[in-house]
Amino acid sequence: MLRLRGANSTRHSAQHARDYSTTVHLPLLGSHQRENATAYAALKVSELDVSDEAIQKGFAQVKWRARFEIARREPPVIFDSAHNEDSFVKLRETLDTYFPDKKAYLIFGASEDKNIPGMFAAMKPKIKRLIVTRADHPRALEEGRIVELARQAEVPYEAVSPVQSALARALENSAKDGSIVLSAGSMFVTAEVMKAWTILAKVSNLRKDEA
């Protein structure tokens, strides 16, 4: 069971086959947090001498930047470190859970060795428009190659660089229709988007409706 708690946390039912169940607060969002809750239950029924209080405290103190990190609730701005097909499937599931009626302006860049068609296939139902960009990193794939793959996947796109400009374009579009601004595909791109967001927030009211 998933329950949204604040901007970036959930409560999960932790259950185990040996008739143990409880509710654990995890300061992270995402369908994959069920696995963490299951690990909690497994710890409780193990032979390890670990108190319930210690386990709860340990999970509550977990911090992981860019793990479905909601920087603003409305219109949503989300930073995620998803960078392969499997993590994109998890990301789409999380979007479907918390924002079932919204699509995203996806600020996207990727490294040369990634399965980009697989990432597009996983996320396509949630993409309002792909905003292709490139991180300032030697492994970052050129925008033109990503655009070619987006065209083949029939994903609506535009190319905007540098990353700061890509964020500005996504925010501009989101302000018009309330769609999500989402950064994913490359940890390098997401790191630059987060830095740009922090700078913009200092000189504007971007965070006025942050949860």
Q: Where are the regions a protein language model picked out?
A:
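RNase H-like, metal-dependent nuclease domains and their acidic two-metal-ion catalytic environment used
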Residues: 190
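Short, flexible loop segments at boundaries between secondary-structure elements
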Residues: 135-137, 202-211
